[in-house]
Amino acid sequence: MLSHDVNIYKNTVEAKKLNDKKFVVLLDPDKCNNQKLNQVIKLSNDAHVDYFYIGGSLLLHSDLDNFLIRIKEQSNIPTILFPGTTHQISQEADAILYLSMISGRNPDLLIGKHVESAAHIKASGIEVISTGYMLIDGGRPTSVNYISNTLPIPHDKNSIAVSTAIAGELLGLKLIYLEAGSGADVPVSPSMINAVSTHIDIPLIVGGGIRTPEIAKLSAEAGADIIVIGNALEKDPELIIDMSAAIHSVNVKSTSDA
């Protein structure tokens, strides 16, 4: 396990300054048995994946602590909680994305659930990274839409996304996360990614509907600092190798252009 002296957010900010794109594999413990987890960890180690995000909309049956311990036994890749509920917390993680759903108007997901979990999270000692979570229409209803009871930002309304992201930054949030949803028909568009990244100074995460290395690369080139892929890798874990190469190739291109 990483030392808690390692500051994941500080490293993320430094990477943004260097245009060093990061690739995240999203793991849902409810969908990942031991055999598949071992396969994903090995592929992730070989492909130099930057982070694991751990979470899901429900996490009904999983022992989160043991899931994280199994990862730590096989990998030095940092583990970051991506919680769907306030119960998805573990001291075995290296950090947690403290999500505020700023795209919607559900008060529980803006601040209400945070009040319930704040004392426990602070006492856990893990690094907390406040994150402005923005749902973007991915062409079909997703689990996040249903669970959050919120409407996504329309796919083609860049101006709304930009204004929302700026508001999140001005409120002091440390990251902005554009999310099309697990299994989305269409990912967040490169034009929206570019518009948002141009207008904020904090790191930008993009996920949902990224099924191919080509889409992943386009998202990174458009301005995403961190690319999150989950559903596509659940179906074909071997994609990790090509996804990583595509995302990290943007780093090489940026360095050579400089």
Regions found by a protein language model. Give the residues of each.
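Alpha-helix-loop-beta-strand connector modules within alpha/beta enzyme cores
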Residues: 64-87, 91, 117-129, 186-212, ...
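Glycine-rich phosphate-binding active-site loops on the catalytic face of alpha/beta enzymes
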Residues: 53-59, 95, 99-110, 180-183, ...
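Glycine/Thr-rich beta-alpha phosphate-binding loop at enzyme active sites
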Residues: 147-193, 234-235, 239
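N-terminal amphipathic alpha-helix/helix-capping segment at the start of soluble metabolic enzymes
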Residues: 1-27, 117-130, 137
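Conserved anion-binding
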Residues: 88-169
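Active-site mouth loops of central-metabolism enzymes
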Residues: 21-37, 83-85, 135-161, 206, ...
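Conserved, mostly hydrophobic/aromatic
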Residues: 52, 168, 196, 219, ...
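Hydrophobic faces of well-ordered beta-strands that scaffold small-molecule active sites
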Residues: 23-27, 52-54, 79-81, 96-98, ...
